[in-house]
Curated annotation (Swiss-Prot):
It comes from the Bacteria. This is tRNA/tmRNA (uracil-C(5))-methyltransferase. It is an enzyme of class 2 (transferase). S-adenosyl-L-methionine binds at Q189, Y217, N222, E238, D298. Keywords: Methyltransferase, S-adenosyl-L-methionine, Transferase, tRNA processing. It catalyses: uridine(54) in tRNA + S-adenosyl-L-methionine = 5-methyluridine(54) in tRNA + S-adenosyl-L-homocysteine + H(+); uridine(341) in tmRNA + S-adenosyl-L-methionine = 5-methyluridine(341) in tmRNA + S-adenosyl-L-homocysteine + H(+). GO terms for cellular component: cytosol. The gene is trmA. Dual-specificity methyltransferase that catalyzes the formation of 5-methyluridine at position 54 (m5U54) in all tRNAs, and that of position 341 (m5U341) in tmRNA (transfer-mRNA). It comes from Shewanella baltica (strain OS185). Belongs to the class I-like SAM-binding methyltransferase superfamily. RNA M5U methyltransferase family. TrmA subfamily. The lineage of its organism: Bacteria, Pseudomonadati, Pseudomonadota, Gammaproteobacteria, Alteromonadales. PROSITE patterns: SAM_MT_RNA_M5U, TRMA_1, TRMA_2. The active site is at C323 (nucleophile), E357 (proton acceptor). InterPro entries: MeTrfase_TrmA_AS, MeTrfase_TrmA_CS, SAM-dependent_MTases_sf, TrmA_MeTrfase, U5_MeTrfase_fam.
Length: 365
């Protein structure tokens, strides 16, 4: 974190520097002009995590500033959603005078939504007892007069959900509203409004598609659910069980009938497609019946492994969302041999940082 860089007055300048840096880094691939999708300059993060500092009777949130090389008190936090900032004030006022709720509390995580829900996770260096549960229930009741809130307590090998451990986000994407179950401690795009722009860009990039879509690393179905409208069928893979469970919920609640999720890694799916191995999880699924001309990938920061990259290269069109330009660049060294970048986008998920979320559409030469 660099608090000094978080100045809305300089946001446009910082974003322009990112655009120039990205175009220069990928110049060798003869990409089209970068499509730039800006963030709100403040209150854009739908989740935030804070450490807790105990100083006598005082208790406050803090973060570590890497530039100053010291902890910084955070009574409010400019990047966080308005809802998180409101909850920060209300929560700390209740925690300070309560011995049970504050004892050995070392971290608080917030997960909020544009739809008005917020989930608060309290993390402790001690086991949570019945007194904590009673006080946490009373805290939830009091906060519920102002917020649509749920509370989770966490300690070593212990998790207590007072009600539920998820929120349901509502995103307006073009003329459609999509609902997404987002589970505590699972990956979600932190900048919801930029996430909407990413979905709209992906839908536009794949309009008039023919055949089916294969998606690897689908998470909670964020992209595959929105993209299903452009394809006959969608087949998606994800390894993390909580994400798969959320994806199944999201498929049902959004009424998507042409999307199937398989719980397996991209590496195993590559082996299955190459018929190197058979998998029980694929029983009853005829992979050969899918006519996937397009593949969508949103890999982790490490990029795509060599076997999966070889699989990806076999498709006519590749839609690649990357959270790490360096690994995207490495992967493009191979993909550029057979495919040409026809769309190139910068999504500013993380203002005031060096981080760049990018999207490329590649089509076979």
């Amino acid at each position: 974190m660099n608090l000094a860089a978080m100045d809305p007055q300089t946001y446009d300048t910082q974003l322009e520097h990112k655009r120039i840096k990205l175009e220069q880094a990928f110049a060798q691939f003869e990409t089209p002009s970068v499509e730039v999708f800006a963030s709100e300059p403040a209150n854009y993060r739908m989740r935030a995590e804070f450490r807790m500092w105990h100083d006598g009777d005082d208790l406050y949130y803090y973060m570590f500033d890497k530039v100053l090389n010291e902890k910084v008190r955070c009574d409010q936090y400019l990047p966080a959603s308005v809802l998180i900032n409101q909850m920060m004030s209300a929560l700390i006022a209740e925690l300070k005078p309560n011995p049970s709720l504050r004892h050995k509390l070392f971290q608080v995580d917030f997960l909020s939504t544009l739809s008005g829900e917020i989930l608060v996770s309290l993390l402790y260096h001690r086991q949570l007892d019945d007194q904590w549960r009673a006080d946490a229930a009373a805290l939830k009741t009091k906060l519920s007069s102002q917020f649509n809130v749920n509370i989770i307590g966490r300690a070593r090998k212990q998790k207590i959900d007072l009600d539920k451990d998820f929120v349901v986000e509502s995103l307006q994407v073009n003329d459609k509203t999509f609902l997404y179950k987002q589970i505590e401690n699972s990956f979600t795009q932190p900048n919801a409004k930029v996430s909407v722009k990413m979905l709209e860009w992906a839908i536009d990039a794949t309009q008039d598609s023919e055949g089916d879509l294969l998606e690897l690393y689908c998470g909670n179905g964020n992209f595959s659910i929105a993209l299903a409208q452009n394809f006959n069928r969608v087949l998606a893979t994800e390894l993390a069980k909580p994400s798969v469970d959320a994806a199944q919920y999201n498929i049902e609640v959004n009424g998507i009938e042409n999307l199937q999720i398989i719980r397996m890694s991209a590496e195993d799916f590559s082996d299955a497609m190459a018929k190197k191995r058979s998998f029980r999880r694929l029983e009853g699924i005829d992979l050969d019946s899918y006519v996937c001309n397009t593949i969508f990938v949103d890999p982790p920061r490490a990029g795509i492994d060599p076997d999966t990259l070889a699989l990806v290269q076999g498709y006519e069109r590749i839609l690649y969302i990357s959270c790490n330009p360096e690994t995207l660049k490495d992967n493009l060294q191979l993909l550029n041999e057979t495919h040409k970048v026809t769309r190139f986008a910068l999504f500013d998920q993380f203002p005031y940082t060096e981080h760049m979320e990018t999207g490329v559409l590649l089509e076979r030469r």
